[in-house]
Amino acid sequence: KNISIKFEEIDINNSSNVLIKPNYMAICHADQRYYQGKRDPKVLSKKLPMAPIHEACGIVVADPTGTYEVGQKVAMIPNQPPCASDEVFFENYRPGTYFLSSGHDGFMQETISLPVDRTVPYDNIPDEIAALSEFTSVAMHAINRFDRLAHPIREDVLILADGSLAFVLASALHYLYPEIRITVVGRNPEK
């Protein structure tokens, strides 16, 4: 495997970004496939070299915006839209949006520079859990869409998957809607 190191100078005096030192990361299957070279060679040639990891939290080391105190903990958001969501399009469907760790350097760096709105402060949550906030947000996005689009009869919900995201989705759905009966169908009978 080839490892490349890239140095980038960041002027923190004229920045609207927060500088963060990652302290906990989670690695997902997509990041594993990049790291292990198990993606299509054409895809790898377009996206590498790149720092992996899109699930992480960290500690603020500098914030010229004054939003955070140095030492404050934040979860980092890998979705980088050119503008905020509106009533028509979610930010991840907007033209110009890109995702860190998918053709753009992810969070496996010594210091990360992110716009303030791509960070979420947290307290009283273990770092190991905060590092999974992006993963959990995928399930919450599905639940928000369900809440907006589903008809009002919600006695039963079927989840067609049995992986880790399906588990998080079922857990969050049960927490938010304890009266709903959830059925999970997958290909692994032991689950």
Where are the regions that the model predicts?
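Conserved hydrophobic/aromatic beta-strand scaffold that supports enzyme active sites
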Residues: 5-9, 57-59, 73, 111-113, ...
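Glycine-rich beta-strand-centered segment in the early N-terminal region that forms part
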Residues: 11-25, 39-83, 123-125
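Active-site-adjacent beta-strand anchor residues
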Residues: 21, 53, 61, 132, ...
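Cytochrome P450 core scaffold surrounding the K-helix E-X-X-R motif
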Residues: 30-36, 85
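NAD(P)H dinucleotide-binding glycine-rich loop of Rossmann-like/cofactor-binding domains
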Residues: 80-156
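Glycine-rich Rossmann-fold phosphate-binding loop(s) that bind the pyrophosphate
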Residues: 135, 161-164
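Adenosine-nucleotide cofactor-binding segment
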Residues: 154-156, 160-162, 174-191
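Residues forming the Rossmann-fold NAD(P)(H) cofactor-binding site
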Residues: 167-168
